């Protein structure tokens, strides 16, 4: 397996198909990417007329860890607590494809040279598809930030886009990964405590509906993603199964007498063409359906995180009200309690205002994306079904027409 791969503008799939309606004053894209063993280097190109930047067009080279650093910087910034932070791109993972190629290279005496070449071609195509999707997901993350009227003004985002040197960001060690896992557990427990034992009542029907909807939506999206992956893998397995069938028929075509030779060769060609068609079906389903579901599973989690932050702010506001009542009853430290209550109130109202707009934008974005991807997938599957029918019909006609 080659440890070096490169993709340019023409080679990127629109695997998430996120609808980005930002203005043209800040345009970001990944113009090139190179894979070197376990690292992928992305060339991030920026075009902007914003006064903050010294130039109107520039590019930098970034690695995955720097994308994660940027995402974490947004999540940890209190100013963005009322916003849906775009989900971080997944870590590049080519290990499975490399292991398959390594096993194939170790050799199997039962595999013919023709079968080996076809299987190697399939695995290399799979590796390239994963690489292109990795690039596309990193690009979508940056474009979501660039299109957002608030997130695009972040200082760290400017540094990420413009600073020409390495950002000296390292990957998280095991202790930090464990810490993040424990924080998620604490957050889940805190949310359950707020909504359950404390008996906190939601004061806005809009957010109560959104919370109920997102809990169900996230579960359904996750289940649909698992099912879509199973269907896609079934198509891939079918395409792989056609390889030995085609090879066996081709071998028979070279051994039999003239009367059967033509039939075997035509059948071998049939299964080879069906193999390529099934491969395209699997690729389209992976790109248009599985990847979209996987992306919105992460995006819906980001929306759930936003609702948790607002719920936490509401709980803090309620606790501040109780503390103020106690202070007034005791007639002690009333002014600090009033000041704290006002701050909690302002934070809760600020988060509520921005969260409502963010959730409405999330709805329109996902509806547009689902409509676009599902229509395109249906059109592609109709095209492939017609092509498959035509191949079978032409093969039958050719076989019947033989002397």
From Swiss-Prot:
InterPro entries registered for this protein in UniProt: AH/BAR_dom_sf (IPR027267), PX_dom (IPR001683), PX_dom_sf (IPR036871), SNX5/SNX6/SNX32 (IPR014637), Vps5_C (IPR015404)
Domain PX: 20-168
Family annotation (Gene3D superfamilies): Arfaptin homology (AH) domain/BAR domain, Phox-like domain
Pfam families per record: PX, Vps5
Single GO molecular function: phosphatidylinositol binding
Cellular component aspect of the GO annotation: cytosol; endosome
Domain of life: Eukaryota
SUPFAM superfamilies to which the protein is assigned, alphabetical: PX domain
GO biological process terms held by the UniProt record: protein transport; regulation of macroautophagy; retrograde transport, endosome to Golgi
Keywords per UniProt: Coiled coil, Protein transport, Transport
Coiled coil: 258-335
Family: Belongs to the sorting nexin family.
Function: May be involved in several stages of intracellular trafficking.
Identification of the protein by name: Sorting nexin-32
Native organism: Homo sapiens (Human)
């Amino acid at each position: 397996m080659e440890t070096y791969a490169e993709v340019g503008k023409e080679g990127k799939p629109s695997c998430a198909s996120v609808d980005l309606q930002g203005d043209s004053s800040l345009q970001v894209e990944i113009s090139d990417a190179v894979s070197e063993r376990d690292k992928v280097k992305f060339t991030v190109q920026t075009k902007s007329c914003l006064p903050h930047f010294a130039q109107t067009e520039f590019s930098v080279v970034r690695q995955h860890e720097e994308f994660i650093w940027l995402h974490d910087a947004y999540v940890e910034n209190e100013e963005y607590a009322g916003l849906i932070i775009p989900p971080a791109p997944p870590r590049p993972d080519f290990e499975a494809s490399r292991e398959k190629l390594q096993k194939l290279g170790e050799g199997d005496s039962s595999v013919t040279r023709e079968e080996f070449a076809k299987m190697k071609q399939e695995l290399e195509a799979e590796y390239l598809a994963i690489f292109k999707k990795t690039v596309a997901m990193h690009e979508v993350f940056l474009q979501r930030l660039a299109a957002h009227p608030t997130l695009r003004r972040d200082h760290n985002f400017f540094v990420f886009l413009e600073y020409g040197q390495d950002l000296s960001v390292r990957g998280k060690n095991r202790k930090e990964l464990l810490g993040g896992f424990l924080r998620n557990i604490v957050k889940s427990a805190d949310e359950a405590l707020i909504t359950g034992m404390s008996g906190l009542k939601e004061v806005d029907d809009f957010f109560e509906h959104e919370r109920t909807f997102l809990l169900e939506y996230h579960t359904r999206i996750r289940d649909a993603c698992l099912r879509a992956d199973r269907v896609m893998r079934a198509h891939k397995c079918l395409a792989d199964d056609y390889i030995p069938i085609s090879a066996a028929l081709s071998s028979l075509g070279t051994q039999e007498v003239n009367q059967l030779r033509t039939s075997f060769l035509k059948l071998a060609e049939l299964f080879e063409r069906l193999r390529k068609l099934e491969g395209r079906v699997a690729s389209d389903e992976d790109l248009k359906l599985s990847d979209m579901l996987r992306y919105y599973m992460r995006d819906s989690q980001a929306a759930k995180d936003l609702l948790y932050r607002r719920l936490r702010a509401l709980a803090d506001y309620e606790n501040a009200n109780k503390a103020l009542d106690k202070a007034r009853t005791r007639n002690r430290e009333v002014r600090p309690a009033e000041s704290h209550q006002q701050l909690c109130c302002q934070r809760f109202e600020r988060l509520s205002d921005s969260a409502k707009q963010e959730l409405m934008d999330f709805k329109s974005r996902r509806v547009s994306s689902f409509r676009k991807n599902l229509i395109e997938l249906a059109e592609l599957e109709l095209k492939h079904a017609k092509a498959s029918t035509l191949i079978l019909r032409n093969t039958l006609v050719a076989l019947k027409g033989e002397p």
